[in-house]
Amino acid sequence: MFTPVNDDGTVNLTEMEKLIELIITQKLDGIYLLGSTGQGFLYAEAERKRIAEAALSITQKRIPVMVHVGALSTDESVRLARHAEEHGADAVSSVGPIYYAASPAMGMAHYRSIAASISVPFFPYQIGNAPMTEEMIRELLEIPNLKGLKLTTLNMLDIASIRISSGGRWTLFSGADELMCHAALCGTAGAIGSTYNLFGPVCKHVRQAFLNGETAMAMAFMLEFQQLILEILPCIWTFFRRGMQLRYGIDIGKAKAPLMTPELAWSDEYLMERIRRVESYLPQLNP
């Protein structure tokens, strides 16, 4: 989920509440808080706790919330994980060690420490195309409350390999929006990504329709969706910001530095035309 921000970079709680209520109204399956899209790494620990508290207070268990707690130090991740559980998070997620070159042993120690500090389900967040070894999977399977993974990779065989090696015991989420249907073929149970803030209902519909056998429609949608992603990727934040304003009346604000992308002034006509093309795959909008 986006973390809406004010001009000074602080969290905009008013817009965040509007976004959360929108997601609940749309009957999406959950909220992933303070991940890459939510700019979690760009907030200090105290601000991350404040955002988590506010979001969990708003949701009031009306929708599952997974809080991302990845940080530079394992100790901070542990504090954030405990805080999230104390305030009602349904699950916790974390990337592996960052900045310092991490060995598999470092990653395992990091994940074990976070998981041991909480009782709610834990979902490591694997980013990149580095494969997860059989040994790593065996060790992760020994962590009692590790219930799955978020996998942001373009390598579908890696996702399938993890599904096979884990014996189907884990709930896997794909993180590459442009491959959400492809990943479903490899055993993912759902998808977590930035574009679902704007296109959540249609993406949920298409993914389920694909699983139900509507492959021609899903292929047509995915090509349309992938074309859009390729077009907007260089200036994706400005597209999201204006798109959310036009479609839902929600201002997510500018991206926090250094995440800012080039400030491209997308025309409202172009934005709405592209949004309509993607949303045309929703039955209620295309009778």
Where are these regions (language model features)?
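Short alpha-helix boundary/capping motifs
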Residues: I51-A52, H83, H87, R112, ...
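Glycine-rich phosphate-binding "P-loop"
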Residues: F122, N145-L146, K256
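Solvent-exposed, flexible loop/coil residues
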Residues: N6-G9, E15, E47, S103, ...
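Active-site beta->alpha loop and helix N-cap motifs at the rims of alpha/beta catalytic domains
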Residues: T3-P131
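A broad structural signal for alpha-helix termini and local helix breaks/kinks
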Residues: T59, I118, S166, R247-Y248, ...
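C-terminal alpha-helical cap/extension of soluble enzyme domains
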Residues: M1-F2, L22, Q26-L28, T37, ...
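A general structural signal for well-ordered alpha-helical segments in protein cores
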Residues: M16, R48, A52, S77, ...
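Catalytic alpha/beta core domains of metabolic enzymes, predominantly
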Residues: S113-S117, G128-L233
